[in-house]
């Protein structure tokens, strides 16, 4: 299962979090966010990382040109679109950056939003479902209605986000079977400053789950 830790701002934390077990790191490319980092800061953070770690930039309502330039300047391997981007826009990003994973984040508060998510699947590589908040795009600490997602079976891989923590991750995964999970505020001391003890605890919980599955419990 993919494990993405989002909102990285410190290069030394990116290396530590990857070594703890993260398969993907997320970098916020939205200037209004308290977790915002520049292309240069992203490059400093991703340069020492192993090649197999996905480096994903999070954008919201940016232009194709801005996204393209940031990817080229920073060394990102993925682009997460977290604003009001249309399926057609997602397709344009994928065409302009064919070697880069395109993720579309959708803030879900009803079954209608889930139906909308299906429309995106043929234009992107991966879906990300986040909790709805009227003012904030992500990192809100709010959880999704997991029960609503139990029958969600998109045709592309999907990540579960929204208020996940080391304390509730096993409960979430007992109800749902996403291809990956995405955590931000649930493993932070403050925005952009990750709590490495919480990250370590997250992976302890995930490893205990894998052990139980492997032992048939």
Swiss-Prot record:
SUPFAM superfamilies: Ribulose-phoshate binding barrel
E.C. no: 5.3.1.24
Main enzyme class: isomerase
InterPro entries: Aldolase_TIM (IPR013785), PRAI_dom (IPR001240), RibuloseP-bd_barrel (IPR011060), TrpF_fam (IPR044643)
Keyword DNA damage listed: no
Gene Ontology BP term (one): L-tryptophan biosynthetic process
HAMAP family noted in UniProt: PRAI (MF_00135)
Disulfide pairings: none
Protein name according to UniProt: N-(5'-phosphoribosyl)anthranilate isomerase
Annotated metabolic or biological route of this protein: Amino-acid biosynthesis; L-tryptophan biosynthesis; L-tryptophan from chorismate: step 3/5
One GO MF term: phosphoribosylanthranilate isomerase activity
Organism: Nostoc sp. (strain PCC 7120 / SAG 25.82 / UTEX 2576)
Catalysis: reaction(s): N-(5-phospho-beta-D-ribosyl)anthranilate = 1-(2-carboxyphenylamino)-1-deoxy-D-ribulose 5-phosphate
Keywords tagged on the record: Amino-acid biosynthesis, Aromatic amino acid biosynthesis, Isomerase, Tryptophan biosynthesis
NCBIfam families: PRK01222.1-4
Family label: Belongs to the TrpF family.
